[in-house]
Amino acid sequence: MNEFFNIIFNLFDVEHIMTAKSSKISRRPVSGVFLLNKPLGLSSNGVLQKVRWLFRAQKAGHTGALDPLATGLLPICLGEATKFSHYLLDSTKRYQTVVKLGQVTTTGDVEGKVVQSRSVPPLTRDMLELVLDGFRGDIQQVPPMYSALKRDGRPLYELARQGIEIEREARPVTIHALKLVDFDTESLTLDVTCSKGTYIRVLGEDIGEALGCGGHLTALHRVQTGHFELVPEYTLEYLEQLNETERDMLLLAPYAPVDYLPQVQIPEGRLKYFCNGQESNIDHDAVPEVLVFEGERCLGLAEITDKKRLVPKRLLNL
């Protein structure tokens, strides 16, 4: 236990040092999306600050936090790409996770204290598939106390650390896919595709309860966010080995979070109007969201109304 806390304190020092360093370097207006493979142990904000420092970016934001003990895909939006980060926050996510059966912890994962132990029933694939089928599709999920959700302005995890538990309302989430990858006498390996707002820790706990023995997560690895898939080699260590030009080549376009949307070219003579946020005419059918280009340069996001009006919604300063 002491070794665990030493690791956490050391990681905190690393994040503190990175934040201090970041205020001393010269910033630049770099824009794009980096598909970071987040390491074990660091917070999402900690790796965000390090990536921002390595790119010397003026602005940066992540697109859905991972707990320190979770690993995998954490898209980092730099500069103008932050204008589209909410599309990734709201997107479907895919995870690979391991659930240890027979033990319930305070946090729903290995960080917490074991508060209950029960025997695990004999497991068969047919039995497990029957239980898992109850968690596929639209379900109700009670958020955990150890979460960043707030009550009266205070994060629930602060209350939980004080031993306070309050009633939480169940919320609707969708489990698009739940695959049993492997299992043994006391653990399950699952592949989960889910909607935003889904807590995989709670899913693991609920599956354990449905089996009558309880459970908690021992590993959580995100492999997909929206249409972005994990690139295993895109680690912090890999970034550190590259020079600035090489790092910039790894960035996706600032509009990459929405590059699946239809695209149109700005009509001749309408560039000034669009860049000033003004509506203009366009000979195009109505589209709720469309990317507007001048040649290969993306100007931003717009709506085309049924009256054939091009209405700017989000402009890119590139």
From Swiss-Prot:
It comes from the Bacteria. Its EC number is 5.4.99.25. It catalyses: uridine(55) in tRNA = pseudouridine(55) in tRNA. One of its GO terms (molecular function) is RNA binding. The active site is at D67. It is an enzyme of class 5 (isomerase). Responsible for synthesis of pseudouridine from uracil-55 in the psi GC loop of transfer RNAs. This is tRNA pseudouridine synthase B.
